């Protein structure tokens, strides 16, 4: 006798809400960075003209945001796959045909859909490893702490494509 539903069912609003909150935070970072001055040096013309070298170009805010989004949407895919499994798995789907097959045993039904979801999520989990922590000095050491934000953005794009497929399943 089932006393409680699995976390993937009971905690869906909390996890989906946390993912939404993470993505809203990321959107805020992207908006802030899109409106910021990132040139180096910054040139301030006028009576009190000034040329200031600084670090506003550093990609840490974007890199952290890409990593955060990657982790959040990967987890969204993970909890989604758990619900796919609960629907298809004859051991836990409360009497539905195995893999929702018309003729269980002779037909594999939607079994491959769950396998595809699991494979996509596994790749997302690998890709969700933060890029921002992987700084490697460049430019003869002058750029000794780089954000690796482009790597994070490229990985995030691939993760989002995989997550879209999982959600489609």
Where are these regions (language model features)?
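Accessory "access/gating" subregions that flank catalytic or transport cores
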Residues: 1-78, 94
């Amino acid at each position: 006798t089932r006393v409680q539903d699995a976390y993937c069912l009971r905690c869906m609003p909390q996890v989906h809400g946390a993912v939404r909150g993470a993505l809203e935070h990321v959107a805020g970072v992207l908006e802030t960075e899109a409106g910021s001055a990132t040139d180096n040096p910054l040139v301030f013309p006028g009576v009190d003209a000034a040329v200031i070298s600084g670090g506003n170009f550093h990609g840490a805010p974007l890199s952290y945001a890409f990593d955060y989004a990657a982790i959040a949407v990967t987890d969204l895919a993970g909890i989604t796959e758990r619900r796919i499994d609960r629907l298809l798995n004859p051991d836990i789907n409360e009497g539905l045909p195995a893999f929702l097959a018309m003729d269980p045993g002779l037909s594999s039904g939607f079994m491959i859909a769950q396998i595809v979801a699991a494979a996509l999520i596994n790749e997302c989990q690998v890709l969700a490893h933060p890029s921002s922590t992987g700084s490697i000095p460049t430019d003869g050491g002058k750029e000794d702490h780089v954000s690796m934000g482009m790597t994070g953005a490229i990985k995030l794009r691939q993760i989002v494509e995989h997550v879209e497929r999982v959600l489609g399943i």
